[in-house]
Amino acid sequence: MTDKYAVFGNPIAQSKSPMIHTEFAKQTQQNMSYSAVLAPVEGFAASIKSFFASGGRGANVTAPFKEQAFSLCDELSELAQLAGAVNTLVRLEDGRLRGDNTDGLGLVADIERRLTSLKDKRVLLVGAGGAARGCILPLLQAGVAQLDITNRTHDKALQLAQLFSRYGNIKALTLTELASGYDVIINSSSAGLTGQLISLPSTIIDGTTYCYDMSYGSDTTLFNQWALSAGACHCCDGLGMLVGQAAQSFYLWRNVHPDATTVMQQLRDALGR
């Protein structure tokens, strides 16, 4: 019998998740299907309940439903609790739903695979929304020496720094307080997609700075264009994070680790990168 999985979102037609998980299943010889479900904005809970009632084994959740998914769970991982959002649902043997958040693990895995080890690094996280919140604990657990957060609205950055203060060395800084020459800079803000980058000082970058944009597309992102012009030594977009978080979800469902590297190359080829 084929096990059913799906990704829920609105919109969802652009999702790469069905392709990614279908390739993971082929690699690991798993008997499973994976589809994309367009959930009504006002009917997400009903869509999820119907899916699991009809035999669904697990699901991914994307915008705008990650916070709603959080509230539907009977059990939550520590990552999901701190993120305040769920992107992975697992149906347990007793029928209860466990929620997890694999976004941050996907980010860390991709940075360490493609850029540099995060251990003992000074890291700047740009943005203080849901994408940032979901990644802070994995970044701290990766052993960063210092994690600074900056955001247009400073209060949001302060709230995140306070929430995660017991997990590591984390500070909220205004744009004028930022240090010089960070080891790694991560952009979690989606503002660049609309052509409105946060006005960051170029002094935060030197010739040894690695930059990572959680966004991705067929062209170099605006943030990475800016970072390269400011002298960053290397930049990456978030396509690998997408594949990395999917690999973590796949492991939670099937207890097997897929090869993310080959699937990421297939995606890059499809995007003409």
Swiss-Prot record:
* UniProt pathway: Metabolic intermediate biosynthesis; chorismate biosynthesis; chorismate from D-erythrose 4-phosphate and phosphoenolpyruvate: step 4/7
Which superkingdom?
Bacteria
Q: Which EC numbers characterise this protein's activity in its record? A: 1.1.1.25
Q: Where does shikimate bind?
A: 15-17, 62, 87, 103, 216
Q: Where are the transmembrane segments?
A: none
Residues annotated for NADP(+) binding in this entry: 78, 127-131, 151-156, 214, 238
Reactions performed catalytically? shikimate + NADP(+) = 3-dehydroshikimate + NADPH + H(+)
Which GO BP terms sit in this record? Answer: amino acid biosynthetic process; aromatic amino acid family biosynthetic process; chorismate biosynthetic process; shikimate metabolic process
Query: Record's Pfam families?
Result: SDH_C, Shikimate_DH, Shikimate_dh_N
Q: Which UniProt keywords apply?
A: Amino-acid biosynthesis, Aromatic amino acid biosynthesis, NADP, Oxidoreductase
**Gene Ontology terms for molecular function:** NADP binding; shikimate 3-dehydrogenase (NADP+) activity
Instruction: Respond yes or no to whether keyword NADP is given for this record.
Output: yes
- What residues form the catalytic site here? 66 (proton acceptor)
Q: How does it assemble?
A: Homodimer.
What is the protein named?
A: Shikimate dehydrogenase (NADP(+))
Which gene name belongs to this protein?
A: aroE
